[in-house]
């Protein structure tokens, strides 16, 4: 279905086409208000902290469980022998670091994955509820539930055993479920379209920031903290999350119109630039067309493959570093965060490269997405295979894994934003589907790893090699599927035929027209013919 240019004089917005990132576009006839720290920037900062807190709660168990498990008591009193294929190490393992619980690797896998069961089942429901009732309270109270139940983790582990702990982590996952869909909805209400790209990137960078903070600090608390070390991880982060939740509910408001102290010029600027999101009805979702769309399945499988590989690294890397590479708890937490620091930095760099590739007109949207995504999925796949052959060289293994996870940052300029290329109108719905499915795949990772390491008293390198090989295989296969069937072009089902009689909102274009994903050019607002 070809695109055509439409008149710049229309202001009616029945078409309801959302444009996330148009360069040199002014949504309002007035100039953007000049303030050092506008209210929308404060909202963005609070959402960044919320995302960071969410990932702290999500990842701290992977470090804590290393300190919780009494490795010398596993297998009915048989002493655990660390992987002896490498011989003596220059940093000996301190057996006094053994914890309170004799949990097998399989049980540890269930504990690590229980959080994700709760997280997965609430993705789509909260996406629907947030659209109908607003996002603020779901996000704030969800994080509050997550934080309060963090205080109960030590109590559940000591009093309720494995399944009591799994229940608490499951409830924490339920509380974290609203984070992504509600954050997305808040950004849609507060951030003008021409700012969403950088503001959205700033908010979601909180995920990597939270992981970077969680890993080393959890390691330090496990070794030097109060109440036996590992419980302090959940007490400290529980306090931080509770404080953030209360502050968020008090100081942040649902939208600019409901904010009592926002500058009137900023409120007008935001409301004028948000193209009628609250006054028009979205067209029906074209379920049949989406189900038949190969580019949609390309994103779906790429997302699922990424989550499986990423969760394998996130949940199992601290255990591998202690049991095989023999890092101490303090070193474990610090060094485990290095790959995510690399991912954070590389994702920032590669996003600039991706923007240049598209703006230079040397690469199409499709070519850019596939090339950058290949780096993001083939890179960690190859690194996992290489790391499985590095043997006892701890420095080389850590370096390879750091590079591999760092390259994984390419996915943020690959399939992660490809929803917007295919369908600006239904991108949120597509994200809820792929994110839910991807997290289902991700929760299988720690369970699979726990069963593959069949002898928990001797986690041999060969067993870990299988874990790495499977994750690498999933990365590469799903990345290849994306390269074959993926697309950066806007899909025909994003523009129903009745849009022909419904002119879209137009805005003042001050410079060159935007370039569409199919290679044609048009003003920022477009309609189909």
Swiss-Prot record:
* Pfam families from the UniProt entry: MFS_1
Q: Which UniProt keywords apply?
A: Ion transport, Membrane, Sodium, Sodium transport, Symport, Transmembrane, Transmembrane helix, Transport
Region of interest: Disordered: 495-529
The Polar residues compositionally biased stretches are 504-529
GO MF annotations for this entry?
phosphate transmembrane transporter activity; symporter activity; transmembrane transporter activity
The protein's matches in SUPFAM superfamilies, at most eight in alphabetical order, are given as: MFS general substrate transporter
One GO BP annotation is: sodium ion transport
PANTHER family according to UniProt:
MAJOR FACILITATOR SUPERFAMILY (MFS) PROFILE DOMAIN-CONTAINING PROTEIN-RELATED, SOLUTE CARRIER FAMILY 17
Q: Which family does the record claim for this protein?
A: Belongs to the major facilitator superfamily. Sodium/anion cotransporter family.
Name of the protein: Putative inorganic phosphate cotransporter
């Amino acid at each position: 279905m070809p695109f055509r240019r439409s008149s710049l004089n229309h202001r009616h917005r029945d078409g309801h086409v959302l444009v996330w990132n148009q360069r040199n576009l002014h949504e309002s006839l007035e100039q953007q208000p000049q303030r050092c720290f506008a209210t929308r920037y404060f909202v963005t900062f609070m959402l960044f902290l919320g995302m960071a807190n969410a990932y702290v709660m999500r990842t701290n168990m992977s470090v804590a469980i290393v300190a919780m498990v009494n490795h010398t008591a596993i297998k009915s009193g048989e002493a655990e022998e660390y992987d002896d294929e490498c011989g003596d190490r220059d940093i000996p393992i301190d057996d006094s670091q053994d914890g309170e619980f004799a949990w097998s690797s399989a049980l540890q896998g269930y504990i690590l994955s229980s959080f994700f069961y709760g997280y997965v089942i609430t993705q789509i429901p909260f996406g629907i509820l947030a659209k109908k009732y607003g996002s603020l309270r779901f996000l704030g109270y969800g994080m509050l539930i997550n934080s309060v139940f963090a205080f109960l983790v030590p109590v559940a582990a000591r009093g309720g055993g494995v399944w009591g702990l799994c229940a608490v982590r499951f409830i924490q996952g339920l509380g974290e479920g609203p984070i992504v869909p509600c954050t997305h909805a808040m950004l849609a209400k507060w951030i003008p379209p021409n700012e969403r790209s950088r503001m959205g990137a700033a908010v979601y960078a909180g995920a990597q920031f939270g992981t970077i903070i969680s890993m080393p600090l959890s390691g330090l608390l496990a070794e030097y903290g109060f109440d036996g070390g590992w419980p302090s991880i959940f007490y400290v982060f529980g306090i931080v999350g509770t404080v953030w939740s209360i502050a968020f509910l008090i100081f942040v408001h649902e939208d600019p119109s409901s904010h009592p102290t926002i500058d009137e010029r900023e409120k007008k600027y935001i409301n004028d630039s948000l193209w009628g999101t609250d006054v028009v009805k979205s067209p029906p979702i074209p379920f049949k067309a989406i189900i038949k769309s190969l580019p949609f399945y390309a994103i779906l499988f790429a997302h699922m493959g990424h989550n499986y590989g990423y969760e394998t690294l996130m949940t199992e890397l601290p255990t591998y570093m202690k049991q095989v590479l023999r890092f101490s708890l303090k070193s474990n937490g610090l060094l485990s965060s290095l790959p995510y620091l690399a991912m954070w930095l590389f994702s920032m760099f590669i996003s600039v490269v991706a923007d240049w590739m598209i703006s230079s007109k040397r690469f199409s949207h499709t070519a850019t997405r596939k090339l950058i995504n290949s780096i993001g999925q083939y890179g960690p796949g190859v690194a996992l295979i290489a790391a499985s052959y590095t043997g006892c060289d701890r420095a080389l293994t850590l370096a390879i894994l750091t590079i591999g996870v760092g390259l994984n940052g390419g996915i943020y300029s690959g399939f992660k934003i490809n929803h917007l290329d295919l369908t600006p109108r239904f991108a949120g719905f597509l994200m809820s589907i792929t994110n839910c499915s991807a997290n289902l795949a991700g929760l299988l990772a720690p369970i699979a790893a726990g069963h593959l390491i069949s002898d928990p008293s001797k986690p041999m390198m060969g067993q870990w090699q299988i874990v790495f090989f499977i994750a690498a295989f999933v990365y590469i296969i799903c990345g290849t599927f994306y390269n074959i069937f993926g697309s950066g072009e806007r899909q025909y089902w994003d523009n129903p035929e009745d849009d022909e009689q419904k002119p879209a909102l137009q805005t003042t274009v001050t410079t060159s027209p935007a370039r569409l994903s199919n290679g044609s050019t048009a003003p920022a607002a477009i309609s189909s013919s």
